[in-house]
């Protein structure tokens, strides 16, 4: 006698239950990987009074803003506010290499590659944090909270960040983060960015999940309200506060000039600021913003536009103080050294698609649902003199964090799930 066959609805019900349980599990994991946005400031760490107290501060460097010669000591205490889509991953690699070379102490996130972004930074988010702990370098993604950061580094720490033309940043952020911003899902056109910019108020909800990625992202990363009225006096007050807190604001569009100013500020060597462009996106089949759409994107991100204009002007004042001719010489030297390292280190001499990367250790983190981020293949025969530097210059952020001892269990779990589901 044949065993009784299961009814179709029973199999369907079991499938639905299993699917619901699995989906719930994924949502739980994702809630750890991407925490909900809180409108208010994170509560200040109770041990705020127990600020960083190093046994002895490093000698103060001579800040040579006027380009004059003078002895200085390399600066080793640095806070880098890593903003989104601004070539900040390339800067991160520079800081990782310097810190590793000099055995400096990093303040790493606990379990992830960011400090629970987009919530505000708090000292309790630092891996192995103890009251009074002191660090040399803080450089992972965070939503900036000055008082919390200030208490983790010596008083002579240098604060830096990097900005980008707000329209271009918005374009990059829209394409990169769009799949995890639900408000973009209702856009039907093949060119969703153009459709959005035709009437952004129709689609945008400031309280929507991950909505901060689509408006005034620089202002948001700096810890300010990205929905302020652009005519509010608070906007200029915040911009001036950034100017007081940060010793140098770099510009992505003038990256080499920015690195020359950074090298001078920190009293570093040329080798310390060599770089390869990391986390670069493959060219999109969608055309770049036209003149009209560029204007719309600029207007939509007006807070960031005010911020960028202010620091674009101050940047060129710093260049003038440094000396135009001197800047041209040092930029040329940096580019020559970068080109030399490219021929020594990179197989084929250029970045490649993810599918063409041969070493898993060189695979960059990819946005959800696509493999649009380029990476590199390391040459197989590199002389002993350059082998270590080449590998460090080409190592992606996640792998470098693990090499430096960061505990990335949440990030690794999320990667496992994504690989399993082929997201």
From Swiss-Prot:
Topological domains annotated Cytoplasmic: 1-14
Keyword hit for Transmembrane: yes
Reaction catalysed by this enzyme: a beta-D-galactosyl-(1<->1')-N-acylsphing-4-enine + 3'-phosphoadenylyl sulfate = an N-acyl-1-beta-D-(3-O-sulfo)-galactosyl-sphing-4-enine + adenosine 3',5'-bisphosphate + H(+); a 1-O-alkyl-2-acyl-3-O-(beta-D-galactosyl)-sn-glycerol + 3'-phosphoadenylyl sulfate = a 1-O-alkyl-2-acyl-3-(beta-D-3-sulfogalactosyl)-sn-glycerol + adenosine 3',5'-bisphosphate + H(+); a beta-D-Gal-(1<->1')-ceramide + 3'-phosphoadenylyl sulfate = 1-(3-O-sulfo-beta-D-galactosyl)-ceramide + adenosine 3',5'-bisphosphate + H(+); a 1,2-diacyl-3-O-(beta-D-galactosyl)-sn-glycerol + 3'-phosphoadenylyl sulfate = 1,2-diacyl-3-(3-O-sulfo-beta-D-galactosyl)-sn-glycerol + adenosine 3',5'-bisphosphate + H(+)
TM helices/strands, residue ranges: 15-35
Organism whose genome encodes this protein: Homo sapiens
EC number(s) given by UniProt: 2.8.2.11
Glycosylation sites: 66, 312
Pathway: Lipid metabolism; sphingolipid metabolism
Keywords: Glycoprotein, Golgi apparatus, Lipid metabolism, Membrane, Signal-anchor, Sphingolipid metabolism, Transferase, Transmembrane, Transmembrane helix
Name this protein carries in UniProt: Galactosylceramide sulfotransferase
Residues exposed to the Lumenal side: 36-423
Localization (cell): Golgi apparatus membrane
Record's GO cellular component terms: Golgi membrane; membrane; plasma membrane
